[in-house]
UniProtKB/Swiss-Prot annotation:
Keywords: Cytoplasm. It comes from Oceanobacillus iheyensis (strain DSM 14371 / CIP 107618 / JCM 11309 / KCTC 3954 / HTE831). It is found in: Cytoplasm. Pfam families: DUF2129. The lineage of its organism: Bacteria, Bacillati, Bacillota, Bacilli, Bacillales. GO terms for cellular component: cytoplasm. Belongs to the UPF0298 family. The keyword Cytoplasm applies. This is UPF0298 protein OB1449. The keyword Cytoplasm applies. It comes from the Bacteria.
Length: 91
């Protein structure tokens, strides 16, 4: 069974506090220079985890990822005619 997950972008002041974020979800990426981390969390626990994370003193800002809500099926996608011709020739 697949669980719907969503990313949280956490902006912080010090890199050493990343260990505390690991208990709330999967830390996918952490940037040392820009001081942010991307954490994946179950969508049904999203509100609770976001409130817990924003209450940490080292966190400056929390943003939700909009990736699950972006449409990825395109209606007006036109195929390349040259590629179709090559596939029909059997090259």
């Amino acid at each position: 069974m697949r669980v719907n997950r969503q990313g949280i972008i956490v902006w912080f002041q010090h890199m050493k506090n990343i260990k505390q974020l690991r208990k709330h979800g999967n830390v996918i990426y952490a940037s040392k220079t820009k001081r942010y981390a991307v954490i994946y969390v179950n969508q049904d626990e999203m509100d609770d985890v976001e409130l817990k994370i924003i209450n940490y003193p080292f966190v400056s800002k929390v943003e939700r990822s909009q990736k699950p809500f972006v449409r990825t099926d395109y209606e007006n996608a036109k195929p390349d005619k040259a590629k179709q011709y090559d596939y029909k020739m059997g090259i």
